[in-house]
Amino acid sequence: MTNQKQTTHFGFKSVDWNEKEKKVAEVFHSVAKNYDRMNDLMSLGIHHLWKRYTIELSHVRPGQSVLDLAGGSGDLTRLLLQKVGDSGQVILADINAAMLHVGRDRLLDEGLFKNIRYVQGNAQCLPFADNSFHCITMGFGLRNVTDKDEALQSMYRVCKPGGKLMVLEFSTPVFPGLKPVYDWYSFNILPKIGKFVANDEASYQYLAESIRMHPDQETLKAMIERVGFEDCHYHNLSGGIVALHIAYKY
């Protein structure tokens, strides 16, 4: 159980453990309406390739049940719906009501409403029965969770035996010379894009800082295996700017 007295990081700041969740909620409430446009601008559209790659490696089949955790505006959910078909189900879960509404409205506007459930829930204490899902995806959400170990334990609990966990997240660049360039872009350009497009420089400053504070590829791999998942491996995408971790519950 989480020690409620300790502190944690919010970007580069040290905050009370209980305060981080509130601050992260404020960030995503602020960015929700511009979330998709900002993702396109910040990544030059490459985030769509990362997400498609993730779903291709999911090997989700018709009839299966999938949890898209921190599903936000629904990018992964849309792709997963094509995989599970009419006999399957995708649950789009997010702790943030504003992001959940954006995802629901966007998918409804695209005519996607069958076999989707929307659930507001905390990754650290998922409101689902044990052994519920064939696959759990989490795209760009884990770094915002206060207690990552507790969240991973919760994911393990609700994953079916034989099921798969897929965590797509910003990570540590591995190409020589890429990290200083990426750092410069993250701290000098991203907040300015946030300021001019979304009138919200502070939230995108947090984004850059949260990426730097997130565990690197090997550390996250060890964290995933520590809660019980096995055969964890990862794929570095765009030189390690993003990593896709895949693990199994046997």
UniProtKB/Swiss-Prot annotation:
Enzyme Commission (EC) number: 2.1.1.163, 2.1.1.201
GO biological process: aerobic respiration; menaquinone biosynthetic process; methylation
Pathway linked to the protein: Quinol/quinone metabolism; menaquinone biosynthesis; menaquinol from 1,4-dihydroxy-2-naphthoate: step 2/2; Cofactor biosynthesis; ubiquinone biosynthesis
Catalytic activity, reaction form: a 2-demethylmenaquinol + S-adenosyl-L-methionine = a menaquinol + S-adenosyl-L-homocysteine + H(+); a 2-methoxy-6-(all-trans-polyprenyl)benzene-1,4-diol + S-adenosyl-L-methionine = a 5-methoxy-2-methyl-3-(all-trans-polyprenyl)benzene-1,4-diol + S-adenosyl-L-homocysteine + H(+)
SUPFAM superfamilies: S-adenosyl-L-methionine-dependent methyltransferases (SSF53335)
Binding site for S-adenosyl-L-methionine: S73, D94, N122, A123
Pfam families given in the database record: Ubie_methyltran (PF01209)
Cross-referenced InterPro entries: SAM-dependent_MTases_sf, UbiE/COQ5_MeTrFase, UbiE/COQ5_MeTrFase_CS
Keyword terms, alphabetized: Menaquinone biosynthesis, Methyltransferase, S-adenosyl-L-methionine, Transferase, Ubiquinone biosynthesis
A molecular function GO annotation: 2-methoxy-6-polyprenyl-1,4-benzoquinol methyltransferase activity
Cross-referenced Gene3D superfamilies: Vaccinia Virus protein VP39
Enzyme class: transferase
Protein family according to the UniProt entry: Belongs to the class I-like SAM-binding methyltransferase superfamily. MenG/UbiE family.
HAMAP family to which the protein is assigned, alphabetical: MenG_UbiE_methyltr (MF_01813)
Role of this protein: Methyltransferase required for the conversion of demethylmenaquinol (DMKH2) to menaquinol (MKH2) and the conversion of 2-polyprenyl-6-methoxy-1,4-benzoquinol (DDMQH2) to 2-polyprenyl-3-methyl-6-methoxy-1,4-benzoquinol (DMQH2).
Protein name: Ubiquinone/menaquinone biosynthesis C-methyltransferase UbiE
Naturally occurring in which organism (per UniProt): Legionella pneumophila subsp. pneumophila (strain Philadelphia 1 / ATCC 33152 / DSM 7513)
Lineage: Bacteria, Pseudomonadati, Pseudomonadota, Gammaproteobacteria, Legionellales
